[in-house]
Amino acid sequence: MGRGKVQLKRIENTINRQVTFSKRRSGLLKKANEISVLCDAEVALIIFSTKGKLYKYATDSCMDKILERYERYSYAEKVLISAESDTQGNWCHEYRKLKAKVETIQKCQKHLMGEDLESLNLKELQQLEQQLENSLKHIRSRKSQLMLESINELQRKEKSLQEENKVLQKELVEKQKVQKQQVQWDQTQPQTSSSSSSFMMREALPTTNISNYPAAAGERIEDVAAGQPQHVRIGLPPWMLSHING
């Protein structure tokens, strides 16, 4: 049969307790040295017997160095834990504070909506009524301001449109004036051309139609024979003039 599990408890017999302490102490110091050498770890071991005798082991006999390092680590750990604890406490306090504030705001909002009024007394209801009246005054004032701003903006746009309309009307009048002048010019052009054509036809008529008017031609021939200078205006051909002079 295998050995049963040994129950750890204080050894009542003083001699046995001293013997066990001596054996276990030696084994513990040996194990500390082994883990320091094998694992390249810094190990510090301090043992006080029941009589107050000190037994210790330190890697490379640097107990003070190891203890100083331990104190720095312990202090930093304590500060970190304390900071985390304070931060956590602050967050919890802030959470409770914000939660109470949110509940108060929600309660006031319900009162403004006319809900949960049973818990309010007469004075609180009067204060709520005054608060609502002040709110309505601010709302109406803001509404009036926005309406005035809107009216001013519309008036400004109206003025701008009127100015644009005046400019367009002026341009339209100028265009109509130009079109009227163009129409008058087009109407006078055919009359001038017709007058010029008629004048040219009258000037050319005696020469082109001389054979059709013998009497008029004879009279003009006599005038020429009498020495009158009208032959310049007759426009007769040269061969007729030579025949008359001959």
Swiss-Prot record:
GO molecular function: DNA-binding transcription factor activity; protein dimerization activity; RNA polymerase II transcription regulatory region sequence-specific DNA binding
Residues annotated as domain K-box: 88-178
Keywords annotated in UniProt: DNA-binding, Nucleus, Transcription, Transcription regulation
InterPro entries referenced in this protein's UniProt entry, alphabetically: MADS-box/MEF2_TF, MEF2-like_N, TF_Kbox, TF_MADSbox, TF_MADSbox_sf
GO cellular component, one term: nucleus
SUPFAM superfamilies given in the database record: SRF-like (SSF55455)
Domain of life: Eukaryota
GO terms, biological process: positive regulation of transcription by RNA polymerase II
Segments forming domain MADS-box: 1-61
Tissue specificity comment: Highly expressed in sterile lemmas, at intermediate levels in stamens, and weakly in lemmas, paleas and carpels.
Region annotation Disordered: where it falls in the sequence: 180-199
Location in the cell: Nucleus
One Pfam family named in its UniProt record: K-box
Its job: Probable transcription factor.
Protein name in the entry: MADS-box transcription factor 14
